[in-house]
């Protein structure tokens, strides 16, 4: 990826994002510096993907509080916490959002005995660390993931977990980018990913621009391409992983996992350890975001169902751990039993 989808413009003190709702037809960058704009950008998926949401929240918290005229630390902390809590209401399922906000809060508390200006500088430092760590994380995930793949493989991915979802290679697409650099000549199949078409609009956009062999398929074609022997592995990202390995990801992931198991195809979940939530015992503890039903009935620029027809629009589903071959993180590859192997990542 040559486009960095989320970054900080230090000269202007603004969060800069590429508006992903306009891709692939228009590349428009937005410069944001107030809480309402940043909340809206996260909620409306102008910036999306678990790692990118965390980065946007961190930089957003910094630029939103930078303009504070608070005369003392107590007042500044009150303003900081108001913005933090507001951001936390934007997307309930992606744990990286809360992880980043907690990191920024922890850094604030570590510097609480300093001046307001010193605390602001510390918040800048922490947000830049989160950005830099994400870049290194994606490279490490790519390296570990590539160790499970062979040249010429057919790979299926869902939604978008590439450079547009992070500050680097991404997660699920990281091994594909790394393999491309090494001449692996993968054949990638991307689900269009209804209802918002992140696979069609975003994944094919970035892979095609990178010169990677990518073929777009409708979501309901996945079973056929598996049966035809075109798929050797399924690679997807994750928004939250429970302690037992149950994984929340874009709606449709669970169905792919069931199909992959039936056809004997490995199902790989790729994501940073920051997406692992050991406080969630199982997938039942993960709150699933419900989005506006208009996204379903107006999905192609015009209404596709009669007015008055109801639509159900959960943004994510949970894949049971029994369908997951391995979870690939920046710290390494973990397999069943996930309750033990995931816990070891944090020891």
UniProtKB/Swiss-Prot annotation:
Record-listed substrate binding positions: 48-50, 91, 198, 249-250
Pfam families for the chain: IF-2B (PF01008)
Cystine residue pairs: none
Signal sequence segment: none
GO molecular function list: S-methyl-5-thioribose-1-phosphate isomerase activity
Entry EC no(s): 5.3.1.-
Pathway named in the protein's UniProt entry: Carbohydrate degradation
Superkingdom of source: Bacteria
Reaction(s) catalysed (UniProt annotation): 5-deoxy-alpha-D-ribose 1-phosphate = 5-deoxy-D-ribulose 1-phosphate
Regions crossing the membrane: none
Entry keywords, A to Z: Carbohydrate metabolism, Isomerase
Active site: 239 (proton donor)
Stored Gene3D superfamilies: translation initiation factor eif-2b, domain 1, Translation initiation factor eif-2b, domain 2
Marked site positions, Transition state stabilizer: 159
Record has Isomerase as a keyword: yes
Family to which the UniProt record says this protein belongs: Belongs to the EIF-2B alpha/beta/delta subunits family. DrdI subfamily.
Physiological role: Catalyzes the isomerization of 5-deoxy-alpha-D-ribose 1-phosphate to 5-deoxy-D-ribulose 1-phosphate, as part of a 5-deoxyribose salvage pathway that recycles this toxic radical SAM enzyme by-product to mainstream metabolites.
NCBIfam families: eIF-2B_rel, PRK05720.1, salvage_mtnA
Protein's name according to its UniProt entry: 5-deoxyribose 1-phosphate isomerase
Gene from which the chain derives: drdI
């Amino acid at each position: 990826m040559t486009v960095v989808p989320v970054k900080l413009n230090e000269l202007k003190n603004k969060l800069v994002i590429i508006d992903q709702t306009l891709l692939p037809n228009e590349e428009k960058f937005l410069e944001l510096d107030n809480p309402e704009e940043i909340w809206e950008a996260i909620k409306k998926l102008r910036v999306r993907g678990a790692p990118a949401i965390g980065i946007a929240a961190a930089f957003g918290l910094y630029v939103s509080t930078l303009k504070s005229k608070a005369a003392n630390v107590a007042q500044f902390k009150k303003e900081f916490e108001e913005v933090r809590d507001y951001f936390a209401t934007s997307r309930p399922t992606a744990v990286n959002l809360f992880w980043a906000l907690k990191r920024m809060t922890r850094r604030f508390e570590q510097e609480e005995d300093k001046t307001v200006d010193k605390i602001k500088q510390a918040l800048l430092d922490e947000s830049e660390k989160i950005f830099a760590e994400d870049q290194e994380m994606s490279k490490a995930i790519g390296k570990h993931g590539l160790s499970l793949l062979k040249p010429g493989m057919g790979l299926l991915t869902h939604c978008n977990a590439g450079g547009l979802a992070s500050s680097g290679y991404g997660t699920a697409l990281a091994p594909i980018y790394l393999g491309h650099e090494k001449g692996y000549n993968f054949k990638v199949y991307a689900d269009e990913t209804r209802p918002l078409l992140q696979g069609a609009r975003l994944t094919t956009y970035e892979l095609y621009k990178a010169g990677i062999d990518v073929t777009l398929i409708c979501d309901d074609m996945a079973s056929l391409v598996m049966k035809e022997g075109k798929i050797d592995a399924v690679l997807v990202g994750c928004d939250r992983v429970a302690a037992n390995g149950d994984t929340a990801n874009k709606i449709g992931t669970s169905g792919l996992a069931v199909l992959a198991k039936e056809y004997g195809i490995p199902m790989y979940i790729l994501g940073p350890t920051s997406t692992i939530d050991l406080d969630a015992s199982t997938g039942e503890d993960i709150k699933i975001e419900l989005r506006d039903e208009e996204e379903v009935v107006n999905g192609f620029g015009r209404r596709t169902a009669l007015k008055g027809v109801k639509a159900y629009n959960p943004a994510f589903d949970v894949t049971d751990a029994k369908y997951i071959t391995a979870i690939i993180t920046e710290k390494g590859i973990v397999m069943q039993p996930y309750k033990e192997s995931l816990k070891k990542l944090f020891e």
